[in-house]
Amino acid sequence: MVRPTAFRMNEETAGNNYYQKVLDNVSPEDIVDQALEEFDNMVDILRSEGVNVIVFEDDPETDTPDSLFPNNWVSFHADGRVGLYPMLAENRRVERREDILFDLEHVHRFKISEVVDFTEFETHSVFLEGTGSIVL
């Protein structure tokens, strides 16, 4: 899980993500504080139920309001393959972090046998945002 330090309505994705809205009378700082509190509470609940939760801190140098949703840029598969997906929004692309994959493999002992990188499709304006996409 990625701890959100810049959480807010993402102006780059709000046009096609109808779950986002501007919250009147709530400061950006209050939104981040509430998101962090909810995140930390969820981590505590999951751990109290025996779930092994790995938390990565968001990169404070980047503007990544959706960083707590890594399931859109990466997927992990039982056979050790990792998928990296092409993202529509520029600030979502910045969420992809090699340090996370490195730590998962070398610190947390995840088996990574192959990284399947589809991100080249961004240059062709073709996007498939991991679990954010559904094929019917």
Residue spans for each PLM region:
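The feature marks the mature, well-folded catalytic cores of soluble enzymes
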Residues: 1-136
